[in-house]
Amino acid sequence: MTTPSTRPTDDRAAGPASVPPPTALLLLRGPRERVAGWVSRSVVPLVVAPVGRWTVAVAAAGPPTGPPYDDGALLLVGRPVPARTGPALGFSETGGRAVITVHAAGRRRGPGWVVWEPGVGLVRPPGLDLAGPGEIVRLAGCPARTREELVDLLHETGPRPVTMLQAVMATLGLPGPRLLQDPVRAAELPGATRHDPSARQVSWFEDAVADSVRLRRELGVLE
């Protein structure tokens, strides 16, 4: 559980065999107490800190859950954020792609997605509800003119995924772009705390996922 009185440890001293944390962070703009409640139910280890009017949640390690729910980046940025806890913007590198998620009031099908691939640009994975640049700009609190700059940026195809994500965050004036490339720095932010999921939380998550898959198979949604 999150312990506000305990400053998180710096994992940079870990041995060479240590697995790097996922490249993912989520910026939430809801009341701090609601964000804390949301964080406390995460199965992804997180470092959380206030950054201006936002709270940043940075993936500190991969989740202890088994496949196919062992992608900590997607589990963090794709997890639904209640309207009273958001809005929120997620940024992650997953499968060699840059992924942005938009959690805003009025979205009934979960987050909106932006997926960008090097050498290709924007892609449209089937089954995902896409987010538009105007929505992202409004949620970030930027002037309307920022939309054109964001569109031009997302049409580039040369950068690496993490570089694209950092450029998007910088264009939107959002805090924390360096944390995508150096997530252990999150532990050094003022007021940073660490959340590690309990074995009970992980068990509840895996049971809920198993029940959902079983129900969908019974309904014929999954083969």
Regions found by a protein language model. Name each.
Residues 12-161:
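Hydrophobic alpha-helical segments that drive targeting, anchoring, or assembly
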Residues 1-9:
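N-terminal acidic, proline/glycine-rich, low-complexity intrinsically disordered segments
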